[in-house]
Amino acid sequence: MSKVEFNKETGPREVFCGLTSIVWLHRRMPDAFFLVVGSRTCAHLIQSAAGVMIFAEPRFGTAILEEKDLAGLADAHEELDRVVNDLISRRPEIKTLFLVGSCPSEVIKLDLATVAEKLNKRFLGKIKFVNYSGSGIETTFTQGEDGALKALIPLMEDSNEEKLLLVGTLANNVEDRFKKIFRNLGISNVESFPPRQSTELPKIGKNTKVLLTQPYLSDTVRDLKHRGCEIISAPFPLGIEGSTKWFLAAAKAFKISALKVHEIISPLISRAKLALESHKDILKGKRLFLLPESQLEISLARFLHNECEMDLIEIGTPYLNKDLMKEEINLLPDNTKIVEGQHVEKQLDRVREANPDLVVCGMGLANPLEAEGISTKWSIEMVFSPIHGIDQAADLAGLFSKPLRRNQILTSKTLVTN
């Protein structure tokens, strides 16, 4: 492991809650429905993040907890039962219904696990009911996916068939390209979790080799290990370097030579390096500060330093699983500072003192920092954009070069005007 400085902070934090992950999960599994048990604030958050009007009947909704529910003057379980019945009568195509806890439901100790169990007995397998927490008390926004996948693992049947399981949501076109590369390598049995249909859960067992596509799935990994799966240790497939080592790790697990991997991906690498150059010209030598929100921060920092030659000031991450991130940390330069957790006021003080060229942060901090003359990039964009893989390296770099390019244009126009 490289000589990295690890620190831990506690205090006030500024992050989205785990409900936000519903935005990409409901698109991934169109036969599923996500029912948040929460407040009107929860409903507004998801609707705004998804950019979908509620009358368009998206595959998510909110069972609103009113003041009488929070005060204990009504039986919230009965009300939830009624809402579920109404929902299923209107949307008979639902195959899996996720009951998603929120801050309000956690506060009043609403037992969604028991509710899901009762509903499963009543509907006798016609619809599967699972539950997880998206509460901001417990989770940051990407951890919502971790909770959802963990909830699905008990539904996955056993199998001793040898397979590669890609774990973590990917854009469909990125997933298709990955599977094509694996087929060319000779790994034909490749499945994804979550699948594109909630009813098509992969079977798992001792011959299942798990390759993570996202770094925020600690609980999911632990439960897959308990089911006998082998976890392949690898960096994450962001950028040329991370993606190459990711493919090499998979090939090694299936006893495929590194020579064959390089033979297949070399054309992709050549094209990606060429496409990366224009962004590298802008990013090279720029100073970067990453505030914690998505758990993608370490992988992004590795890519931006090693492939775009940015200078790292500080990498913040909400949580740090050193086992999952070991291969990423090994690729960081010596003396890199990683801060787990957050005391937002102290971190903002360090940002102002360092005066970086670019800050990766949550939406709530971006505008105030921009007002102080500091260029920012929303970290949530990394989750909504197809950034994985060798051929997406230039697009990933472009997300960071864009605000710097914009800043250069605005500065030059200001100088001309003056």
From Swiss-Prot:
Substrates-to-products reaction catalysed: chlorophyllide a + oxidized 2[4Fe-4S]-[ferredoxin] + 2 ADP + 2 phosphate = protochlorophyllide a + reduced 2[4Fe-4S]-[ferredoxin] + 2 ATP + 2 H2O
Annotated cofactor note: Binds 1 [4Fe-4S] cluster per heterodimer. The cluster is bound at the heterodimer interface by residues from both subunits.
Pfam families xref list: Oxidored_nitro
Pathway(s) of this molecule: Porphyrin-containing compound metabolism; chlorophyll biosynthesis (light-independent)
Residues engaged in binding [4Fe-4S] cluster: C17, C42, C103
Protein's GO biological process: light-independent chlorophyll biosynthetic process; photosynthesis, dark reaction
GO molecular function: 4 iron, 4 sulfur cluster binding; ATP binding; metal ion binding; oxidoreductase activity, acting on iron-sulfur proteins as donors; oxidoreductase activity, acting on the CH-CH group of donors, iron-sulfur protein as acceptor
EC number of the protein: 1.3.7.7
Primary enzyme class: oxidoreductase
Cofactor: [4Fe-4S] cluster
Keywords noted in UniProt: 4Fe-4S, ATP-binding, Chlorophyll biosynthesis, Iron, Iron-sulfur, Metal-binding, Nucleotide-binding, Oxidoreductase, Photosynthesis
Described purpose of this protein according to its UniProt entry: Component of the dark-operative protochlorophyllide reductase (DPOR) that uses Mg-ATP and reduced ferredoxin to reduce ring D of protochlorophyllide (Pchlide) to form chlorophyllide a (Chlide). This reaction is light-independent. The NB-protein (ChlN-ChlB) is the catalytic component of the complex.
Quaternary structure, from the entry: Protochlorophyllide reductase is composed of three subunits; ChlL, ChlN and ChlB. Forms a heterotetramer of two ChlB and two ChlN subunits.
Family affiliation: Belongs to the BchN/ChlN family.
UniProt protein name: Light-independent protochlorophyllide reductase subunit N
Gene responsible for this protein: chlN
